[in-house]
């Protein structure tokens, strides 16, 4: 079928009426041998919330809401208030659905970040439906083209292991094609720099090294670590402090020339506009499962483009989010890296969905070509892996 004929076969508005929204909180335990220590603690389980939106015509869209370390609570918000707000609306009216949730739930007395997490999964599912309705992958709907996007080895990996173990873990990642890796810091400045230095010496200047403190630093630690990070040519220092600690970020800017990165814990374009005004965080990392979905990440990216700020979307838990990130990166002019998930035995990447991306020999990924987000969801997985309440990190 030609592209023109395919566009002519779009569903009628009545077929696109939203008739059901269902969020599925899901978890699996992390084996001790697969657990990684980060600035936020040691992982004991992985959580996710999968959102399913169904239309009157039988189209089904899938999205991921970040669990917010309270998966049952976020899923309940989707299944109650947000469901009631959006039932009966046109699934193609993605902006209208976003605005209604914002006006009625988020803008005033509406649980703030929790609502952003919940609405993000709905938004992704609606984009999935839009693509399926016209037979296009999401990146084409967003105005993008298929092009290689550089990836770095990230996810819940490369934590506080001894330097020799880190080096051993990195070798197979480079064999997979990755040209860039992200090391977890936020332990102590001394041990952090020892790890970064060991990796730099082992692999030379050709390897791009990025770092993520997962909010584990205070101002003194960031000041102590910055010279070593700069000496090793680190590409960025991600989230040294909690997202709303604007004063510490402002102070840290004077500690050296390593760019500060953040955004996975900032919500909606309104919080990102503050980052632009402050001119301290110069690499943005919005998460399509946290900050308001694909719709809002595109707004953030376009806003950042006017200020020459690069966007490197943060990857969440599942292959749904990962596929969505690649679609976004293929559709913006200020995109940077895709965060490849190299965590061990991630069932949300390997079993819940079909393959969300493939890293080629040059360390790049391409957006999926199937209609919508391009991934298929195994609904039996959701039955077999019910939510495990409690903290994800200890």
Language-model regions, residue ranges each:
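Flexible C-terminal active-site loop/helix
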Residues: 4-5, 13-19, 23-30, 48, ...
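Glycine-rich, aromatic-flanked loop segments that form ligand/cofactor-binding clefts
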Residues: 119, 123-159
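Conserved, mostly hydrophobic/aromatic
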Residues: 18, 58, 82, 122, ...
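Shared catalytic-loop signature of beta/alpha-barrel
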Residues: 80, 227, 233, 244-364
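Metal-dependent enolase-superfamily TIM-barrel catalytic cores that perform enediolate-based chemistry
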Residues: 147-256
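Metal- or metallocofactor-binding catalytic centers and their adjacent structured scaffolds
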Residues: 20-22, 54-133
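Short Pro/Gly-enriched beta-strand edge/turn motifs at strand-loop
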Residues: 30-37
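Hydrophobic faces of well-ordered beta-strands that scaffold small-molecule active sites
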Residues: 61, 151-154, 181-183, 209-213, ...
